[in-house]
Amino acid sequence: MFSENLRENWSFVKTIVEARERKLKKYRFFEKLWKVLEEGKNLIFLQAPTGAGKTEAVLTPYLKSLVEDEREWHSLIYVMPTKSLVFNMFERICKAVNVCKNFLGIPKRLVVSYDYGGFIPVKPFLEGDITITTYDTLLYTFYGFRPYGHHILLSLSKVIGSLIILDEVQLLQDEYWYSFSLLPYHIKNLLLFGATVILMSATLPKLLIEGIKDSLAKGRQIAKLQYGVVKADPSEDIVERGNLKVKAENGRLSDNLLKVVEGNEKPLLLIFNTVERAVEAYRKLREKKLKTLLLHSRIVSVERKQREALFEKGDSVDVVIATQVVEAGIDFDFKTVATEISPIDSLIQRLGRCARRRDGEAKIFTDLEQAKTVYPENVMKVTFKNLDEDMLSDSVRDALKASELVNNVYTQDVVEQLKSSVHEDIKRILAFVKPFTGKMFDRREFYEDEASNLLRYSVEVRCILLPQDLYKQALDSIKAKGDNKIPLEHNRAVKLFTENNLSISLPRKAIKIPALEHQLNNKKVYLSLYFSEKGLEVRKYDKIESYIRTNQIGYLIINPNYYEEIEGYHLGLVKPFDYGNF
C-alpha cells in the first residue's frame, strides 16, 4: 500500500517541480517524511538543506488527499516568519495548486488564502483549504488576541484536524532565546487541539528540539501524541547543487567593497548586518556600470516586491546588496556571496544563497565589530571559534554538518546566558500559555499587559509613507483641532495602504524614533492613519507607548524627511532610531 502511495506522491512532486522548470530528484527524506505521516505521527521535525525541496515534500500528501476526496487533514496551514515570505510562498503554492488542478485532478474549487499582516480592506476569517500566514498571526489569533496591524482572525476550528507547517523556524531566533523558549509550549497547544505539526528548517538547534520534547513530556493529555525526526542523510541524499568554497577573510566587508565587487564573478550578493551599511555600500556602487539592486526590510512594500520579483523572473542582475532579508525565500543562484560575520545558523542560511545550481565562492568577513548591537556578543564569540571553512562549505548540502555547527554554538551555557535577562518575562508568558487548554476564557486581563510579547521580545508596528499632499493634509487636520478626516477616493486609499506600508520592530528598551515623530505646534507627536469607507482618519499620540497600549489597527505615519531616495530609487527608512545613550 505504501509503495503505491509513493508512486502517486512522486507524480505530484514531478508535476510541481517541472512546472518550475526544475529537474525531479527523488530524495529519500521525502519518503521518510511521507512514511511517518502515514504512521500517524502528530509532530515531525524535518531538517534538510536549502534548495532540497522541503516545500514540495510537505505539500504533496495534502494535495494527493484532495484528489482522492478523502482528506487526511481538514486544511493545510503554512506558516512563515515574515510577511514577505508569506507573499512569496503564496505565489509559489498557487502555481503548484494550479498545475495540479490542470494535470492531476485536484478539485477546481480549492481555495488558497493568505494573511501576512498587511492591509486588508475587508476583514474575513482566515479560511481556505490552504492558508499561508505568519507565526504571529497564527499564534495571536489562536489565543484570541488581535495583534497590532491588520490581521485576519483564525478560528480555533481551523486548527483542529489541520496540517500545520512551521517553516524557516530559525528566523524566529532572537538575542534572548525568547521565541524559542515559548515556541515549544505553543506547539504543544496546537497539538492538543488536534493539529499535525511539521517543524522544518535547514538549521534546527538541538536545544529547541529538546525543549519541544520536554514540553510534550508533561501533562496527561499529551501522552498519546507521537513525534518523528526526519533528516536528509548525505549518504543517501546528495543534494543537487554546485560545489561551494568558503573562505574566512580578515577585516570588514565595507572596507573591501570595491575589491570584492571588481575581483569576483557575478551575480554577486553582498550581505550586511545593518540597513545603514547596506545603503552606504549602495551609494558607493551606484556610480559603477553594474546592475545593482538594494534589498532590506525598511523599503515600502510596492518597491520591495518589485525588486524581489526580479529574482523570480530570472532577470539579469550583477550585484545585490542586502541585509538579513535574503536568508530565506530568495530563489536565485549567486555565483559569489560576501557577507559580514553573523551567528552560525544565520551564516549557513546566507551561504545557501550561493552555488545553488553551479559552483560558487563565499567570503565571510570576520570583524566582530560589525555584529555588535545586532547579535549577542557571546554567540558571536563562539561562532568565530567555529568558523571551519570546510564544514561551512559542506553545510549547505549536508544537514548533519549544519546541525553539528549550530549545536557547537548554541550550547546549554550559551542559551542560558541569552535567557538570563528575560527569565521573568518568559515565566509570565508561560503562566498564560501552559494552562491555556484548560483555562481558555480566563485571565483576559493578560491581554493588556503581556499579549504583545506572546511570541517575540519586541513590538512590531505598521508604518505608512504618505505622498507630500496627503502628509500636509494630515498635519493640517490635526492642527485644526476639528474633524480629523481626509477625504480620499476609495480605490486610492486602498492602493495607499497596500503599497506604501512597511514595518518596524521596536525593542522593549526605551529609544527615540525620530522617523515617526512630527513637529506640531512646537511639540513632537506621533500620528496614526486609519482607513474608512469615506477616506482617511488621523489620530495624534504624545507617546508611542500610548499608541501601542490602545491596540489600534492604524498605521503610524512616517516623517518623510527620514525616508531616503536617490533619483527616484528608494533607499528606504535608513535610520529610524536614535539610541542616544542606550
What residue ranges belong to the model's regions?
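Conserved pre-motif I regulatory segment
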Residues: F2-Q47
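Walker A/P-loop
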Residues: K41-P61
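Conserved Walker A/P-loop ATP-binding site and its immediately adjacent core
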Residues: E72-V97, L204-L208, V275
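Inter-Walker segment of RecA-like/P-loop motor cores
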Residues: N98-R146
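Conserved helicase motor
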Residues: V112-V122, N273-E276, T292-Q306, I321-E327
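SF2 helicase catalytic motif II
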Residues: L138, H150-L192
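Interdomain hinge/linker at the junction between the two RecA-like core domains of SF2 helicases
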Residues: K206-E262
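C-terminal helicase lobe and adjacent C-terminal extensions/tails of nucleic-acid helicase motors
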Residues: K259, E280, K284-E287, H296-E308, ...
